[in-house]
């Protein structure tokens, strides 16, 4: 126990010595342990405690809550993008090739430092993405990728705000807040209901946008390994490897989702083809049967009653023919879901008119 306390004291001494004095007394900045505790608590809550509490409960209906939350996140992300951009990246003050950290108390510099802290704070607000999934029992969306992404980010950004608030690494925040504007706009429209689905034609590009973001961050960070720049190499590797890890995770998710969608579409197409073939065979049998009935009527022309009823049978089969044609799409459901359409089942059970006359 004494050894652990000695290690903690030495770590605090190191952080006091090398940490940025401007952020030393800001909320959650004096020590990494509160942030670490919040991240571990988040993982436990969404993977263990939350699903256990919701196991025997009905999913919460959070439509209005989600609309409000996503709207706030869009506004918050837009404000962060503006603050990070106006403090350097979008004004020409920052250099995309190499931007050392400015440790002065210049107003524009302090504006960037404050933007960095608020960006760090935003990583905690994003925990609610997962909390709402758990409350709505959308457990499939609480994936390993999702939990790793949200669970690691606050701790990662904490180190940036503690030691290098500003400079080259804030390019990460600039791109990330832009992507979040797009992402939470999509979530907002989705929460507002089906009538807004027609405006979401671009949703298939969201994962691609995420991957482009990580490639840009990776290239922007790793370029400092090949040029002389007064920026800590440890943070170059930290940010670059984060980008590489998330790039591979998102790419794996993209590929698995794309392949699964492709398989579902192929299965649906095959089901429609089989249903059409079966309907065609059934219709052929119905036409052949009608032909026999009409021939039989010709041989029994004196019996007007029989002729009338037999022709009625042909008409009935004609109706069945149309019904089978219309029902081919519903028959496809049988191959996909295993539920036999009602009208086909009734047609199969119904005796012919000729048998009724006999």
From Swiss-Prot:
<dbReference type="Pfam" id="PF01151">
    <property type="entry name" value="ELO"/>
</dbReference>
<dbReference type="GO" id="GO:0019367">
    <property type="term" value="P:fatty acid elongation, saturated fatty acid"/>
</dbReference>
<comment type="function">
    <text>Could be implicated in synthesis of very long chain fatty acids.</text>
</comment>
<keyword id="KW-0812">Transmembrane</keyword>
<feature type="region of interest" description="Disordered">
    <location>
        <begin position="285"/>
        <end position="322"/>
    </location>
</feature>
<feature type="transmembrane region" description="Helical">
    <location>
        <begin position="207"/>
        <end position="227"/>
    </location>
</feature>
<keyword id="KW-0808">Transferase</keyword>
<dbReference type="GO" id="GO:0005789">
    <property type="term" value="C:endoplasmic reticulum membrane"/>
</dbReference>
<comment type="similarity">
    <text>Belongs to the ELO family.</text>
</comment>
<feature type="transmembrane region" description="Helical">
    <location>
        <begin position="66"/>
        <end position="86"/>
    </location>
</feature>
<keyword id="KW-0275">Fatty acid biosynthesis</keyword>
<keyword id="KW-0443">Lipid metabolism</keyword>
<dbReference type="GO" id="GO:0009922">
    <property type="term" value="F:fatty acid elongase activity"/>
</dbReference>
<keyword id="KW-0276">Fatty acid metabolism</keyword>
<keyword id="KW-1133">Transmembrane helix</keyword>
<dbReference type="InterPro" id="IPR002076">
    <property type="entry name" value="ELO_fam"/>
</dbReference>
<feature type="transmembrane region" description="Helical">
    <location>
        <begin position="26"/>
        <end position="46"/>
    </location>
</feature>
<dbReference type="GO" id="GO:0034626">
    <property type="term" value="P:fatty acid elongation, polyunsaturated fatty acid"/>
</dbReference>
<feature type="transmembrane region" description="Helical">
    <location>
        <begin position="234"/>
        <end position="254"/>
    </location>
</feature>
<feature type="compositionally biased region" description="Polar residues">
    <location>
        <begin position="285"/>
        <end position="295"/>
    </location>
</feature>
<feature type="compositionally biased region" description="Polar residues">
    <location>
        <begin position="311"/>
        <end position="322"/>
    </location>
</feature>
<keyword id="KW-0444">Lipid biosynthesis</keyword>
<protein>
    <recommendedName>
        <fullName>Very long chain fatty acid elongase AAEL008004</fullName>
        <ecNumber>2.3.1.199</ecNumber>
    </recommendedName>
</protein>
<feature type="transmembrane region" description="Helical">
    <location>
        <begin position="115"/>
        <end position="135"/>
    </location>
</feature>
<keyword id="KW-0472">Membrane</keyword>
<dbReference type="GO" id="GO:0042761">
    <property type="term" value="P:very long-chain fatty acid biosynthetic process"/>
</dbReference>
<feature type="transmembrane region" description="Helical">
    <location>
        <begin position="171"/>
        <end position="191"/>
    </location>
</feature>
<feature type="transmembrane region" description="Helical">
    <location>
        <begin position="147"/>
        <end position="167"/>
    </location>
</feature>
<dbReference type="GO" id="GO:0030148">
    <property type="term" value="P:sphingolipid biosynthetic process"/>
</dbReference>
<feature type="compositionally biased region" description="Basic residues">
    <location>
        <begin position="299"/>
        <end position="310"/>
    </location>
</feature>
<dbReference type="GO" id="GO:0034625">
    <property type="term" value="P:fatty acid elongation, monounsaturated fatty acid"/>
</dbReference>
């Amino acid at each position: 126990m004494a050894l652990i306390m000695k290690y903690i004291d030495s770590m605090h001494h190191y952080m006091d010595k090398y940490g940025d004095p401007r952020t030393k007394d800001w909320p959650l900045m004096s020590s990494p342990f509160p942030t670490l505790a919040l991240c571990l608590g988040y993982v436990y809550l969404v993977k263990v405690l939350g699903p256990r509490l919701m196991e025997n409960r009905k999913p919460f209906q959070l439509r209005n809550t989600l609309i409000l939350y996503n709207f706030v996140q869009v506004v918050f992300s837009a404000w962060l993008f503006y603050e990070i951009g106006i403090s350097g990246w979008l004004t020409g003050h920052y250099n995309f090739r190499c931007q050392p950290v400015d440790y002065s108390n210049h107003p524009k510099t302090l504006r960037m430092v404050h933007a960095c802290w608020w960006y760090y704070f935003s990583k905690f607000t994003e925990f609610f993405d997962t909390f709402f999934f758990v409350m709505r029992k959308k457990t499939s969306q609480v994936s390993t990728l999702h939990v790793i992404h949200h669970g690691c980010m606050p701790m990662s950004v904490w180190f940036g705000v503690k030691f290098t608030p500003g400079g080259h690494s804030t390019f990460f925040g600039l791109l990330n807040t832009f992507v979040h504007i797009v992402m939470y706009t999509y979530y907002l429209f989705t929460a507002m209901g089906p009538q807004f689905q027609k405006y979401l034609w671009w949703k298939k590009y969201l994962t691609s946008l995420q991957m482009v973001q990580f490639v840009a961050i990776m290239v922007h960070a790793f370029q400092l390994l090949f040029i002389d720049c007064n920026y800590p190499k440890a943070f170059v590797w930290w940010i670059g490897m984060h980008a590489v890890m998330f790039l591979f995770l998102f790419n794996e998710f993209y590929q698995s989702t794309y392949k699964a969608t492709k398989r579902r579409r192929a299965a649906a197409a095959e089901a429609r083809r089989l249903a059409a073939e079966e309907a065609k065979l059934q219709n052929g049998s119905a036409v052949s049967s009608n032909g026999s009935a009409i021939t039989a009527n010709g041989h029994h022309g004196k019996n007007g009653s029989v002729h009338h009823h037999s022709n009625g049978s042909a008409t009935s089969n004609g109706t069945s023919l149309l019904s089978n044609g219309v029902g081919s799409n519903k028959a496809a459901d049988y191959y996909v879901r295993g539920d036999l359409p009602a009208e086909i089942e009734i047609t199969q059970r119904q005796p012919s008119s000729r048998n009724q006359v006999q």
